[in-house]
Amino acid sequence: MIRQAHASLDIISRRKKAEKIARLLQIDRFPGPIRLLEIGCGSGVIAHYFAVHPSFHCDVSAVDVLDQRVEKDNYHFEVVQGSQLPFDEASFDVVISNHVIEHVGDGAQQLTHLSEIRRVLKPLGSGYLAVPNRWMLTEPHYQLPFLSWLPTNLRSPYLRISGKGTHYDCRPLSACAFEEIFRAGGICTTNIGGTPFSDLLYK
């Protein structure tokens, strides 16, 4: 399946998201310097925010399968293929995966994504992972009501009938499914946001 680019390139909204992540992870309480990785950096605004913030002292790396960045300075960037990360084990104090896991592929590829986060994260490190809830009333990528509620084989036909695409290339998860895949990946998590019909936030 050919996967579409879904990155938000709006600087203002991405900066607000970066501020939210910093607040939820309490980055200002981390002893510096902090090695931080953003997976699926899209616009680059979040990576840039952490790289230049005077209070955080972050050494930032970022990866994505495409280079769509509008903010390119003050951090290291690499284009990657798939979910494998080009970093050594226990390399980072913080790993951010913001609305990425629903784009990496099927359940096995999603598990690889989580396993790679665990591999590169230091034993006492922290991660931030957000994913659209499958049960959101309006699917956020295509703005169609109940799109992700449908069985997998009906999502692409609905997309075509709506005129908004030809195939549905995302795999959002319910809270239960996501917690199951976390357990399979051997990752300890805390739910830090989300309701039955909103984004799921974990650290």
Name every feature range the model reports, one short phrase each.
Residues 105-117, 126-203:
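S-adenosyl-L-methionine-dependent methyltransferase catalytic module, highlighting the catalytic core
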Residues 84, 102, 136:
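Active-site micro-motifs of SAM-dependent methyltransferase domains
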